[in-house]
Amino acid sequence: MMELNELRETIYKYALQNAVKHNGKAETGPVMSKIIAERPELRSNAREIVKIIKEIIEQVNSLTLEQQLTEIKAKYPELLEEKKHEEKRKVLPPLPNVKGQVVTRFAPNPDGPLHLGNARSAILSYEYAKMYNGKFILRFDDTDPKVKRPILDAYDWIKEDLKWLGIKWEQELYASERLELYYKYARYLIEKGYAYVDTCDSSIFRKFRDSRGKMKEPECLHRSSSPESNLELFEKMLGGKFKEGEAVVRLKTDLSDPDPSQIDWVMLRIIDTAKNPHPRVGSKYWVWPTYNFASIIDDHELGITHVLRAKEHMSNTEKQRYISEYMGWEFPEVLQFGRLRLEGFMMSKSKIRGMLEKGTNRDDPRLPTLAGLRRRGILPDTIKDVIIDVGVKVTDATISFENIAAINRKKLDPVAKRIMFVKDAEEFSVELPESLNAKIPLIPSKQEMNRTIIVNPGDKILIESNDAEDNSILRLMELCNVKVDKHNRKLIFHSKTLDEAKKVNAKIVQWVKSNEKVPVMVEKAERDEIKMINGYAEKIAADLEIDEIVQFYRFGFVRVDRKDENMLRVVFSHD
């Protein structure tokens, strides 16, 4: 248990915070929740901790509210820095079997960009390491230069995406640079009789496997051969004496296992790297470890305590457990979660890779890649909230883009600038009795951030074609009410106030002064298509920064993608 004085200090802090929130009276339950969320390992001492909490709450509640506030300001000023518009993120449940430092890892295959599905493991692994003040490791699982061939750029894509999510790693390594280590462990397992070299045709091994050991062992299998004989064959593999497909190293497992994939699974195989060079190490190696062999070796070497992975890896967990038992290692605690499906997007890594190979960029807003979501204006905190909210559940989860947009909108609403934008624009001259000023809030929650647009009699303005119905009365946002004379291309002054607009049920529309217009091209993802929308924004749009996310009135949120000489290019986020 943490030092008693430190524990009492932490309880006192949260008791003060809870008291101030509830008119000077703290309660045991919320304070206890804070303590357990911060230090999950204390759950086993809950009974003793509750006694201390009650004692300290009695002390805190004896203070006046003013005294409580004074105490917080003096000792814990950070508690008063409330994030007004940030919703409280759901707390992950405690990890099982925490004994010392928690060490987690994310082990992506760099054969494509990260998407929402495979980023789940990264976010959960990092958040748990952070929760326990542990260690988070980034390990590139790049040991298949043929079937799941790494893409050289993908290493940087993944690191860029993780940094965008706010994920920091203490160690970075590449499985493709650790082959000598895997060879060392392979030799040991062969020496101990736990592994052997199979030189049979794969069809022969399948017959042997399917017989569950009843079939006489083929001579080419070498399962019963001496360790010395198998070591000699292994050295021949390393020496290039066998071609691809002529020899593999297998782990001895239970021949009666009902799952055929578990029976004597392949630890290492030969890949012709002259034909399929690895993007990092070229053709230096031709004997490559399989995913399961390399993973369990590195999990042990790196001291991984908890592995968070999709339940589709359940079979892999059992395969890796064999090696752990042969080596006498403690097996990491494995937490498995269901698939995460995003409605309206393709989640298949192979399909995404196919699009990339045909020239589609990884940040295409149609894709569920992190780069695509980022370019679309989805905030990293939104992604993290979605993943943490789903949590570690074995059941599959489905998230629609509408869910993501709703969370993103809540985060953007209080801080995003509002800009007037007109698509399908029609130009009209405005007939006014005098010059008028439109004072429009840049951010509604910050009324002091107004901008003033002066409109003089006869000025030309743009409104949307759909709004320009002949003889209709419109309210030009924050300016005045006008009647549409479509034939003469005029907007004729009707009245000034919003109340008068309400009396005639006038539609409130956005508008742009013609002589101040900023040409805008909107890139909008619609299922499998990209739609380009032309329009004009008000003058202030020219001052927007790249990556800034703003709301176009009556259109939606957009992210500034590029600023060309005569065009502002934005990507549509959501309504």
Swiss-Prot record:
> Which protein is depicted?
Glutamate--tRNA ligase
Among SUPFAM superfamilies, the record links this protein to: Nucleotidylyl transferase, Ribosomal protein L25-like
User: What positions carry the motif 'HIGH' region?
Assistant: 108-118
Domain of life according to the entry: Archaea
Q: What GO MF terms are annotated?
A: ATP binding; glutamate-tRNA ligase activity
The EC number of this protein is 6.1.1.17
Q: What does this protein do?
A: Catalyzes the attachment of glutamate to tRNA(Glu) in a two-step reaction: glutamate is first activated by ATP to form Glu-AMP and then transferred to the acceptor end of tRNA(Glu).
Q: Name one GO biological process term.
A: glutamyl-tRNA aminoacylation
Please name the Gene3D superfamilies in this protein's record: 2.40.240.100, HUPs, Ribosomal Protein L25, Chain P
Compartment(s) of residence: Cytoplasm
Q: Name one Pfam family in it.
A: tRNA-synt_1c_C2
A GO cellular component annotation in the UniProt record: cytosol
Query: Which controlled-vocabulary keywords does the entry list?
Result: Aminoacyl-tRNA synthetase, ATP-binding, Cytoplasm, Ligase, Nucleotide-binding, Protein biosynthesis
Enzyme class, broadest EC rank = ligase
What reaction does this enzyme carry out catalytically?
Answer: tRNA(Glu) + L-glutamate + ATP = L-glutamyl-tRNA(Glu) + AMP + diphosphate
Tell me which species this is from. Saccharolobus solfataricus (strain ATCC 35092 / DSM 1617 / JCM 11322 / P2)
Per its UniProt record, what InterPro entries does this chain match? Gln/Glu-tRNA_Ligase (IPR050132), Glu-tRNA-synth_arc/euk (IPR004526), Glu/Gln-tRNA-synth (IPR000924), Glu/Gln-tRNA-synth_Ib_cat-dom (IPR020058), Glu/Gln-tRNA-synth_Ib_codon-bd (IPR020059), Rbsml_bL25/Gln-tRNA_synth_N (IPR020056), Ribosomal_bL25/Gln-tRNA_synth (IPR011035), Rossmann-like_a/b/a_fold (IPR014729)
The similarity comment for this entry is:
Belongs to the class-I aminoacyl-tRNA synthetase family. Glutamate--tRNA ligase type 2 subfamily.
Principal location listed in the UniProt entry: cytoplasm
